[in-house]
Amino acid sequence: MSARRATGRPYAAAFAVCLPALALLAACQSGTGQSTAPGRGATAPGGAVVVASFNFPESELLAAIYGLAIRHAGIPVRLELDLGPRELVQPALEQGLVDVVPEYLGTALRTLESRPGVLMPDPAAVRAALARALAPWHVQVMTPAAAQDQNGIVVTGATARRLGLHKVSDLRRVAGRLTLGGSPECTDRPYCLPGLRKVYGLGFAGFLPFGTEPERVTALREGVVDVAVLDTTDGNLATGDLVLLSDDRHLQPAENVVPVITGRALARYGKRLAGAVNAVSAQLTSQALLFMDWRVEVAGAGVRAEAHAWLERHGILPRPG
C-alpha cells in the first residue's frame, strides 16, 4: 500500500483522531456553525455534490479533475481538497458527508476487508469485491480508469546500468548487498517488504524508513539507499534519472483510479453525474497522471490549473477563445 495513500495508523485509532474534523465537515454540510451528528441524509448547501480528496497532491488533482467535469455538466459542486487521511475520508463517505471520492481499487478494498478473497491484480475482480464491500453504505463503484498508482520498486539509472536491472526479479542476485528505503509501514504491508520477500525472495542487506516520499527520493539520489519504494506515478519518475523496475511476478494489486459515489447523489443527478465521471475515467491514463504529478509536485503547477488544462486537452472542457 502506497505511503501516499495510507497513514500506517490503525484504522480505529486514527478514526478517533479524526472525529473533530468529521464534526466540522458535518457542520459545513448543515450550513450552520454548530456541529451536527453526521448521518446518511446530510446534504451540502444548495444540493451541491461534495467531491473530496485525500491529503496528498495526486488525490487533490484527481478530485479537481472529476469535480470540474461534474460542474461542467451543470451540477453544483463543492470541492473538499486535502480533506484528510483515509481514516477520515472513508467514514465521511460512508456517512454521506461527501458524495464523490476518486479512489484506488486495491487500497480501497484492503481498507474495508483485510482478507479480500479475490485475485488482487485483477481489476474486474477487485472492482466487484469493492462494490460488495461498499453496498451497505449505498455507495456505488463507477467504471475504473486505465490510470493506476501502485507501489513501485525504483533504482537510479546508474544502479540499473551497473547491475543490469530491468525487473524486480533481477534484484534477487544482488539484494543481499543493497539497502531498501521505504515508508515506516513498509515492514508490515503485504505488498511491500513482506511481499518482496515472499514473492520475489528478496533479502535486502538493510532497510531504512522514511516518513515521506520526497525523503525517499532524496535518499535514493544521494546513495543513502540503493532501492526505494515509490509510487508508480511519482512525478520524479518523469525526470529521467530514476528507473522503475517491472513487477514481473505481479506482487502489486490493481490500483486503478476509480470514482466512488453515494447512491443519494446518483439518485439526484442520475446520468449527468455518471456521464461526467465516466468521461474522465475513459481518458485518464497512468502516463497522463505521471506527467500531471510531475507538473504539480516537481514543477510547482497549481492543482486546479493542471486539472483544468487536462480537461481542456481531452475535450471535456472547452478551450478558451
Please name every model-derived segment.
Residues 1-18:
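Bacterial N-terminal signal peptides that target proteins for export
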Residues 24-27:
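C-terminal motif of bacterial Sec signal peptides marking the signal peptidase cleavage site
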Residues 29-32:
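Bacterial signal peptide processing site
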Residues 46-78, 146-218, 222, 301-305:
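Bilobed "Venus flytrap"/periplasmic-binding protein-like clamshell domains
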Residues 58, 185-191, 197, 202, ...:
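An extracytoplasmic/periplasmic, membrane-proximal ligand-sensing/linker region
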Residues 99-103, 225-231:
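Paired acidic/hydrophobic, glycine-rich loop segments that form the ligand-binding mouth/hinge
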Residues 112-122, 127-142, 222-224, 236-250:
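Ligand-binding "clamshell"
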Residues 151-161, 256-269:
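A bilobed periplasmic-binding-protein/Venus flytrap-type ligand-binding module shared by bacterial periplasmic
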